[in-house]
């Protein structure tokens, strides 16, 4: 007999119905819970799904450079801001240890005002350059910033007597340089450092940097060549240090890499050893000034000749570019003060500047009047009496004839800057004299032929001539004279 009671059919039916009801209830509860979970997830995730995900741009910061007292080779990587266009990698820079860092010597003398003042029509129609350069150039010195926008360049050209042909001629010249650059980044034969620096200045005058789409590789190669030379020569820059004229190469190259550093620093472009080369090369100029206040061949500090105006003018341009970098240099103020005193001794009563003392070279025409005038404009302002006297000489005696001569481009490289810095009638007269002649003389390949009667120490190399001509045509926008530039 079974120990369990047998359920009646009715009880069995009710039990089965109860089981089915429990299963259905459990399933419904599970479905409701799942639905609630899904709704909760949708509530959380749906807003993010409806918003377009932003584009994430990442870049790798450059590792800090380590000091190494041994000879080494560096494969420079150009780092830049995320928004910048791509550029080529720099060439290999062989670096060597620069001269030991000296302890800074504090200057206790009061620093004179080295900015431009207001001169005769100085800066008329130029604006103040303080409206922001855009495109990452906002912290570039205002005097240099306007060259970096095509619109600003054309505006400067239009407002100051230039035209679109000037811009076209400059671009043709830059393309000529691109085609003729050597594999090591240089131009020129026995004077590679000086010529490469002049060409680099022409590129920078058009705001071409290592990030430039068309000329970035060319510019990077030129900077790399000069930095490599500086590192190998422990702060000195020249093709031949045994040639007494190397003081020219050094100053022009220091000028060029200082200006390059100003752009690269603002654009977060890290070219190895560029900063160090700027510091050592500009400091060399300061530390090797002649006792006269000028600069001499081979940087002879004690030579009785005391230097000359031609050498000195390039050193002064390099010092101005060095100040624009924002880097620290020992005794810069005292150096510039003494140099300006030297320049005063070279100015004749008629306003011209001699080569050594007040004596001009050749036929007596002051081919260095623009150089001397520019030195005072850069470091004292166009209102300075020496600068005014120099401009009066330029107004009366400048000659520019590209077909028959005289046409000393070395003289006019300086005079074109001095004239536009002064502005007014002086610039209008000078611009009318040179602009169209220079444009019409350009060769189809973008170069310029050597002009007749080019003056003392004439050089007929097409790279040299083309670099000077290009810098003259960039004078409309290369610097803003109303805010203390001009180089």
Task: Write out the residue ranges for each language-model feature.
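Intrinsic-disorder/low-complexity signature in envelope-associated proteins
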Residues: 2, 6, 10-12, 45-167, ...
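Membrane interfacial helix-start segments of signal peptides and signal-anchor transmembrane helices
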Residues: 16-39
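An alpha-helical repeat/solenoid feature that recognizes helix-turn-helix modules
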Residues: 133-172, 186-218, 231-436, 447-485
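Alpha-helical architecture
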Residues: 28-32, 306, 443
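Short hydrophobic/aromatic segments of transmembrane alpha-helices and their interfaces
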Residues: 18-22, 51-52, 169-171
């Amino acid at each position: 007999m079974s120990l369990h009671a047998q359920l009646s059919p009715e009880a069995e039916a009710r039990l089965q119905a109860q089981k089915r009801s429990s299963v259905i209830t459990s399933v419904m509860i599970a479905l409701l819970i799942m639905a609630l979970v899904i709704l909760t997830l949708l509530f959380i995730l749906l807003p993010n799904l409806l918003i377009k995900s932003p584009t994430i741009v990442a870049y790798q910061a450059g590792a800090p450079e380590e000091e190494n007292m041994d000879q080494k080779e560096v494969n420079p990587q150009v780092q830049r801001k995320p928004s910048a266009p791509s550029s080529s990698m720099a060439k290999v820079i062989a670096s060597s240890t620069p001269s030991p860092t000296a302890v800074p010597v504090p200057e206790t003398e009061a620093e004179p005002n080295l900015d431009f003042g207001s001169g005769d029509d100085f800066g008329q129609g130029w604006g103040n350059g303080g409206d922001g350069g855009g495109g990452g150039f906002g912290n570039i010195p205002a005097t240099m910033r306007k060259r970096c926008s095509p619109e600003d360049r054309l505006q400067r050209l239009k407002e100051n007597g230039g035209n679109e042909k000037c811009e076209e001629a400059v671009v043709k010249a830059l393309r000529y340089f691109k085609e003729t650059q050597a594999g090591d980044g240089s131009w020129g034969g026995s004077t590679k450092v000086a010529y490469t620096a002049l060409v680099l200045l022409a590129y920078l005058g058009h705001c071409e940097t290592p990030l430039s789409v068309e000329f970035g590789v060319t510019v990077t190669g030129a900077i790399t060549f000069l930095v490599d030379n500086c590192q190998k020569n422990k702060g000195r820059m020249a093709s031949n240090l045994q040639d007494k004229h190397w003081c020219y190469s050094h100053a022009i190259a220091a000028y060029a890499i200082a200006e390059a550093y100003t752009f690269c620093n603002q654009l977060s472009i890290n070219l190895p050893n560029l900063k160090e080369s700027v510091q050592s090369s500009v400091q060399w100029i300061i530390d090797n000034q002649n006792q006269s206040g000028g600069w001499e061949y081979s940087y002879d500090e004690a030579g009785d000749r005391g230097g000359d105006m031609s050498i000195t003018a390039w050193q002064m341009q390099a010092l101005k570019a060095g100040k624009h970098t924002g880097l620290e240099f020992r005794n810069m103020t005292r150096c510039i003060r003494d140099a300006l005193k030297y320049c005063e001794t070279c100015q004749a009563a008629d306003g011209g500047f001699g080569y050594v003392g007040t004596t001009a070279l050749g036929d007596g025409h002051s081919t260095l009047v623009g150089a001397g005038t520019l030195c005072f404009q850069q470091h004292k302002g166009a209102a300075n009496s020496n600068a005014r006297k120099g401009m009066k000489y330029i107004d009366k005696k400048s000659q520019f004839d590209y077909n028959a001569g005289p046409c000393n481009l070395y003289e006019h490289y300086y005079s074109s800057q001095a004239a536009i810095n002064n502005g007014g009638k002086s610039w209008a007269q000078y611009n009318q004299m040179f602009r169209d002649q220079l444009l019409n003389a350009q060769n189809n390949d973008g170069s310029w032929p050597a002009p007749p009667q080019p003056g003392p120490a004439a050089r007929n190399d097409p790279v040299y001539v083309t670099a000077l001509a290009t810098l003259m045509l960039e004078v409309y926008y290369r610097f803003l004279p109303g805010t203390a530039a001009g180089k």
